[in-house]
């Protein structure tokens, strides 16, 4: 409280250490919390993530909030097309400035980045309702895979993701897909509703 922060720093804190307060600040930077949630849900509709209703900006449990592994894959695919997102998500460590004289260290909780060749990024999470969750992306030999996990036993999600990615790369071109991810709708949400990375917010 009483400090201002760069939007880019808030995104980095959100994606590296799951800073729930950063998610709240980013949502409110759209004008209000309700406006921020409207932007999030509009983006979900644009991506045809129809299993998703966001109630909290940080994903903490709330009545009527829900998503699916399928929708998380849609979000990850979209993130892979956004250089700014990848920059924040692939940050392994850094400093988060608080005021003019103080800073705290950031270390990316996604250990896949440092331990899996070809890892592109991802996000680890946990809530009481969802259990341990994980979204991970990796690329090898020109082939990109996304893996999504929900309700994992604690501390097993990274190893489970590695096993799924290993299998996916091993069978590339040898198996038939059971389906395809829906593409985004043609109309896009207004980017003016989103805070610019260079902006400072209180």
Regions found by a protein language model. Give the residues of each.
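Active-site-adjacent loops and short helices of periplasmic peptidoglycan-processing enzymes
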Residues: 1-70, 74
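Domain-terminus/edge residues, biased toward the C-terminal soluble/receptor-binding domains
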Residues: 49-53, 57, 61-202
């Amino acid at each position: 409280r009483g400090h201002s922060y760069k939007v880019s720093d808030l995104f980095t804190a959100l994606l590296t250490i799951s800073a729930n307060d950063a998610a709240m600040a980013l949502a409110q930077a759209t004008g209000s919390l309700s406006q921020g949630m409207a932007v999030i849900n509009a983006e979900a509709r644009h991506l045809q993530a129809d299993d998703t209703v966001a109630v909290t900006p940080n994903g903490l449990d709330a009545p009527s909030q829900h998503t699916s592994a399928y929708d998380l894959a849609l979000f990850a695919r979209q993130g892979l097309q956004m250089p700014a997102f990848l920059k924040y998500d692939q940050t392994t460590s850094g400093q988060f400035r608080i005021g003019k004289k103080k800073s705290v260290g950031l270390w990316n909780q996604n250990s896949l980045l440092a331990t899996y060749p070809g890892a592109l990024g991802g996000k680890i999470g946990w809530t009481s309702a969802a259990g341990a969750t994980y979204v991970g992306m990796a690329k090898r030999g020109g082939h990109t895979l996304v893996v999504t996990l929900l309700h994992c036993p604690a501390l097993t999600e990274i190893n489970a993701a590695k096993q799924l990615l290993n299998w996916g790369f091993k069978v590339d071109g040898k198996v038939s897909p059971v389906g395809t991810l829906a593409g985004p709708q043609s109309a896009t949400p207004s980017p003016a509703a989103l805070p610019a990375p260079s902006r400072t917010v209180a």
